Amino acid sequence: MPAGGLIVAIDGPSGTGKSTTSRALATRLSAKYLDTGAMYRVATLHVLNQGIDPADSAAVIAATAVLPLSISDDPASTEVLLAGVDVQKDIRGPEVTQNVSAVSAIPEVRENLVALQRALAAKAHRCVVEGRDIGTAVLVDAPIKAFLTASAEVRAQRRFDQDTAAGRDVDFDAVLADVVRRDELDSTRAASPLKPADDAHIVDTSDMTMDQVLDHLIHLVEASAERSNQ
């Protein structure tokens, strides 16, 4: 594996295996891991906890201007703190999932969190950064960019299985409808819409195992290192 500074940007919608693969890749590369999606989920939870309507942009901006957020960059840790309390389970709940697109679409919210994301990546020096706009907005100069995708049905099934395993009472059709709805919101928002960077490698994970996706990403990292050494 290449040593020294390294930034890998991994983007894509939910249900593509992005988080699991990004954590595994960071571990293989002995790198830090930054889940930017979790940061938007924490912001959404913070808004909901205060009884604010996510559609009230002014109130959301005010509530998230100073966010008491702390997130681990250890790929083996899922700890996410809001005001000192670990909320990693709460931010994956249905209410946050239904509202995170609305909160993250607000330009001022994105500006604040993007500044934090850039600072954390720079501090880590060697980091796998996962999100929806890393290659297109947050770290546009990242030497390695991958965009993971999969069909809506496959992604809905993965989320349904994940929620069921976590003991949540979910309906597949409702999960699929939410996946389609969120895709529409994320890809059409004015601020940093979800789309591949022009220089991103597109990886369709629909029929791939996590190990296959991981091997593919490692190949991209190694190929990038070889080009840099030429």
From Swiss-Prot:
GO molecular-function terms, A-Z: ATP binding; CMP kinase activity; dCMP kinase activity
Q: What is its main location?
A: cytoplasm
Gene3D superfamilies xref list: P-loop containing nucleotide triphosphate hydrolases
- Any one GO biological process: pyrimidine nucleotide metabolic process
Going by the UniProt record, its keywords in alphabetical order are: ATP-binding, Cytoplasm, Kinase, Nucleotide-binding, Transferase
Q: Where in the cell is it found?
A: Cytoplasm
Q: Name one GO cellular component term.
A: cytosol
Give the highest taxon in the source lineage: Bacteria
Per its record, the protein catalyses: CMP + ATP = CDP + ADP; dCMP + ATP = dCDP + ADP
Could you say which residues form the signal peptide? none
The EC number(s) attached to this protein equal 2.7.4.25
Which InterPro entries has this protein been placed in? Cytidylate_kin (IPR003136), Cytidylate_kinase_dom (IPR011994), P-loop_NTPase (IPR027417)
Which amino acids does the record list as binding ATP? G12, P13, S14, G15, T16, G17, K18, S19, T20
Give the intrachain disulfide bonds: none
Q: Does the keyword Kinase apply?
A: yes
Q: Which family does it belong to?
A: Belongs to the cytidylate kinase family. Type 1 subfamily.
Name used for this protein in its record: Cytidylate kinase
The gene coding this protein = cmk
